[in-house]
Design a protein with these regions (language model features):
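Residue-level signal for cytosolic alpha-helical hairpin/rod architecture
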Residues: 87, 120, 171-176, 232
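A glycine-rich phosphate-binding loop feature that marks nucleotide/adenosyl-phosphate handling sites
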Residues: 71-73, 122-123, 157-162, 196, ...
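Basic, alpha-helical terminal appendages of large translation-related enzymes
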Residues: 180, 185-186, 195-283
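Short, solvent-exposed segments of well-ordered alpha helices
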Residues: 4, 122-133, 162-165, 181-188, ...
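Short, charged, low-complexity loops and linkers
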Residues: 92-93, 118-129, 149-160, 176-186
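Generic structural concept
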Residues: 132, 136, 168, 172, ...
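Conserved, charged catalytic cores of large soluble enzymes
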Residues: 20-22, 26-28, 139-178, 198, ...
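Structured secondary-structure scaffolds
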Residues: 1-148, 192-194
């Protein structure tokens, strides 16, 4: 009827269900709907929390299990605006630093439900601190020592000491903690839990100093390196949704064929592979 037009949001909202097979592929639609999380910007909350549920209920379609409104990225303390010229092009960041570090920063820095501030200074600080110093450097230390002292073969862990058991137990409980945080949309806290574990493993390496221990007790040093390597593998698996490309490189470097989140999947005797620095430090 040429006398009537469709409200643009009415037409747009329907795409959420038609895109996953509504009225076209029942099996596909049933596998996707109702969605667990409907993540939207806070500026379109009314559209998604009032109009959309009304449309679904009138059609007899189940509502999303939750609707979560995220905040805005600010440039410093101001909303990004072309007229102000304070817009950062994420593609430029990706060209300079890679997509995974950008993904990591955005998910680590934003508290979902609140606005977050972007500055190049905070991006570089987060990259160097978390990724270059903590995560990437741990892989470099472990792989270098194994290649130098164990013919690049993952050493046998042998019998665990108390400090080893602590790393193992923390690693085993990590996935359940992460699952709870993600279910509550606390992604930044979930990422920080993993990074805290990586920092704990770095301290474990410092306390045991396998670069010194290997000169006196090669078996004991091998145990330390196995524990640290397995903790790295587990951390990479948990971080893979955030940084799929870089964690894949790490897992390949460790010859880790298993992405299971249970402990002890590194296979002694497997040969480590050469790799480029995982996160070259930004000068």
């Amino acid at each position: 009827d040429s006398d009537y037009v469709t409200y643009v949001w009415f037409d747009a909202l329907i795409n959420y269900i038609t895109a996953v097979g509504f009225k076209e592929d029942k099996d596909q639609f049933d596998s996707w709907w109702p969605v667990s999380y409907h993540l939207i910007g806070k500026d379109i909350l009314t559209t998604h929390a009032v109009y959309w549920p009304t449309m679904l209920l009138s059609a007899g379609i189940q509502l999303p299990q939750s609707i979560f409104a995220h905040g805005w990225w600010l440039m410093g303390e101001s909303k990004m605006s072309k007229s102000l010229g304070n817009v950062i092009n994420p593609m430029d960041l990706i060209d300079d630093y890679g997509v995974d570090p950008v993904r990591y920063y955005l998910m680590r820095e934003m508290v979902l439900g609140h606005d977050s501030s972007f500055t190049m200074e905070s991006f570089i600080q987060r990259y160097n601190s978390d990724l270059a110093n903590d995560f990437g450097n741990l892989l470099s230390r472990v792989s270098t020592l194994i290649k130098k002292n164990y013919d690049a073969r993952i050493p046998e862990p042998g019998d665990y000491l108390e400090s080893d058991i602590q790393i193992k137990m923390k690693g085993e409980s990590l996935s359940s903690q992460i699952e709870i945080l993600i279910a509550d949309m606390r992604l930044n806290e979930a990422i920080e839990e993993i990074m805290q574990y990586i920092r704990t493993v770095n301290k474990y390496m410092e306390d045991n100093a396998p670069w010194k221990l290997v000169k006196e007790d090669k078996i004991a040093a091998g145990r330390v390196l196995y524990i640290a390597g397995e903790a790295l593998r587990l951390s990479a698996v948990l971080l893979s949704p955030v940084m799929p490309h870089r964690t894949s490189i790490l897992l390949d470097a460790l010859s880790a064929r298993d992405t299971d989140i249970s402990w002890g999947k590194l296979i002694p005797g497997d040969i480590l592979k050469d790799h480029e620095p995982l996160f070259p430090r930004i000068k």
